[in-house]
UniProtKB/Swiss-Prot annotation:
Domain of life (superkingdom): Eukaryota
Assembly behavior: Part of the 50S ribosomal subunit.
Major subcellular site: plastid
GO CC list: chloroplast; ribonucleoprotein complex; ribosome
Keywords, alphabetical: Chloroplast, Plastid, Ribonucleoprotein, Ribosomal protein, RNA-binding, rRNA-binding
Origin species: Phaeodactylum tricornutum (strain CCAP 1055/1)
Subcellular location: Plastid, Chloroplast
GO biological process: translation
Function description: Binds the 23S rRNA.
Gene3D superfamilies listed in its UniProt record: Ribosomal protein L31
Name of protein: Large ribosomal subunit protein bL31c
Amino acid sequence: MPKSDIHPTWFENTKVLCDGKPLCLIGSTKSELQIDMWLANHPFYTNSQVLIDSEGRVEKFMKKYRLDITEQ
């Protein structure tokens, strides 16, 4: 017999948003997903040589854990 209450809540109609605009509905464990990029605005698919200006991994980590980069 399977264990009860060990699985996350499943949302059948999860909204996928890009820049605040709804893109589609999917199934997920989150009620809403915010994405930065998708095929309609990705430089590879739009044939543009635009530099993607997004936070680097280190900066994102430091911001997430509220750390100061100048700390030694």
